[in-house]
Structure formats: C-alpha cells, structure tokens
C-alpha cells in the first residue's frame, strides 16, 4: 500500500498557497485568522 503523502511542490502551492487562499472567501478568513494570531507564515 502506498503512503498518502506524495509531496509535489506545484500541488502544495496550488492548494495551500497564498494566491489560492485569496481566491475564496473562506481562504481569506484563514489568512485573517492567521494574521490575527500573529503567524510568521500566513500560507505555504
């Protein structure tokens, strides 16, 4: 059985990247929450 995590930089950026977060309303909420919390990195 293969493992579930098969790393890919492109997929990582496309699904969890900053631009991807900005595209959806909920993604913007994620960024806002992380800003409020004071995260050093907002997205991948």
Swiss-Prot record:
MF terms (GO), sorted A to Z: structural constituent of ribosome
GO BP terms in the entry: translation
Residue segments, region Disordered: 1-44
Keywords: Ribonucleoprotein, Ribosomal protein
Gene Ontology CC annotations of this record: ribonucleoprotein complex; ribosome
Pfam family, one: Ribosomal_L34
PROSITE patterns assigned: RIBOSOMAL_L34
Similarity comment: family membership: Belongs to the bacterial ribosomal protein bL34 family.
Protein name (record): Large ribosomal subunit protein bL34
Species name: Nautilia profundicola (strain ATCC BAA-1463 / DSM 18972 / AmH)
């Amino acid at each position: 059985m293969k493992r579930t995590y098969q790393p890919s930089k492109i997929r990582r950026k496309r699904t969890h990247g900053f631009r991807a977060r900005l595209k959806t309303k909920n993604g913007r909420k994620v960024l806002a929450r992380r800003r409020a919390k004071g995260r050093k990195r907002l997205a991948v």
